[in-house]
């Protein structure tokens, strides 16, 4: 086994990015792939990420394997400045980057192979992920609308022409049962195919909360000629799990909380998230210096179910005066989304005099439909009505369930057309200037089917990007950049009016280094960003409200080093000071939110330490690993500055042994010291506790 190769891959992945990966296997059988020579990532051109004036973290499949990560949201915790946000009862992946999140009532947005994954994604598996790129700061000047704190792009596993694959089974406490598989081979000299997926059927530490999910991803590659390739990928998701709002916290007492308690109703059953996606991409090499990349994506998704949720309105909630009565709402959701997008771009290089220009120009378009059917039942305000209340210490699931009544029934359509251009100008061998611009025409139409009223808006957004990068030597790059971004806000406010788009401005300065002294890779960045028209939740009515202008400043640091030829240490730290920049009155609650208020679920301090050691035990190639994750305290409710989620530190251990060339066994223990902690919050009565100690064993067979 080539330990040195694996250590090098980990160093590269933690530092910035690898443009190509080697055709070898890691100690745990991870398949490492060779990219097709003419294949280029969209919105990238011929400029590797390491040469861009931007903080970028790349999480490789090798890291996912060594950390035993099987969910996308867990992978994002490997990078600083990414924190969990309210995730709609555990149904979606939701995060903030550099303190900025999108709409709390919708899943966070990210790209898959450069296509926006709009709609409903559930809790994404990592089974088909080759790498995850976390590009900090607004990316609208290139990628179009996206999350304001940064752009996340998932690169999926591609078909290979050499037969390889694996199957893996994982079992653990809380009846965890998880299976993964991956197989790729050639069908002819010109075509190759791949099929991978994951299935899980597990309980959780939360009473009556289980997860059943299936992810499948078949793909085909056709090398039409030496210069042209056509690829097709499909993604299938079917996820079923109860919507779980977590626990309630009274008087900021986090000590006397039953973190296993479920306050919904077991008769509601599971919410279901379904998605079917298609991607078709044509790569053509026009000449040695120029490429054309064009693609089409179609994605149909839905989110349906009924839940019984703890009532949040003080005037309807009885738990504050009677510890035996927890008031509840009953909600029904039927959300449908359809996204169709296409793009075409030309990239290449030219020399004008002694100056080299790396040029990228393109056009993209999308059409996004989202239909919302939302029903709710709740007691009258101030009535003291005990209907559908439960005793939280002895819940009764035999009482009559009220029927939710229609609250929101809308049909929304968003259309966007973008034209973008970028030029990386190589002024000298060491100095480069990046200039980029994008123009977007955005249209939004919302039809309220209850009142037959329509809301429409049309805007044209101009988003520039400017950066400078200096190659101090072949190992170290220094950079500075300024970028602007925008993101359309979906839905209506409490007055049934459409929202203005979010707009972001960001400045950063930093350094990246790779392979210094053949052992050190990493980065450091200082950033300052502002955002307007940010949305926050109005939890009382399940809609959103404009928080106004917010700002975020901070520093990020990452370092990966080989302590020895067999041992790798990785350190990551982020300080984020994210707060409101103006005084605001919450429209629904009538609560003032003063300037300088913290942003919900954003920690000032985040730290991550990982130690990996490769060795031989009883003549078998083995791996030992330990990680320590620290998350600082966070605001738990936008309208209550005194509700603060405590900080926490978690320790995880892992070990694996290769029994032979084909079979390996892996053991994992997460939250080793069984710490009680809280991952995120929407409100003091909707606070999500983290998992206690979990352990699992995996057996992997590769072929």
Where would I find each of the regions flagged by the language model?
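Acidic, small-polar-rich N-terminal luminal/periplasmic segments of exported/outer-membrane proteins
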Residues: 27-162, 485, 509
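Outer-membrane beta-barrel translocator/receptor signature
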Residues: 106, 127-130, 141-218, 224-228, ...
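Acidic/polar loop-and-plug regions of large Gram-negative outer-membrane beta-barrel proteins
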Residues: 200, 204, 216-285, 300-337, ...
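Structural signature of Gram-negative outer-membrane beta-barrels, strongest in the C-terminal barrel
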Residues: 223-225, 337, 356-368, 410-531, ...
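Face-selective signature of the C-terminal outer-membrane beta-barrel domain
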Residues: 278-300, 328-447
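Membrane-embedded beta-barrel scaffold of Gram-negative outer-membrane proteins
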Residues: 283-297, 301-307, 477-479, 501-584, ...
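Gram-negative outer-membrane beta-barrel transporters
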Residues: 428-430, 528, 546-638, 673-674, ...
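C-terminal beta-signal and adjacent terminal beta-strands/loops
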Residues: 569, 617, 629-637, 656-703
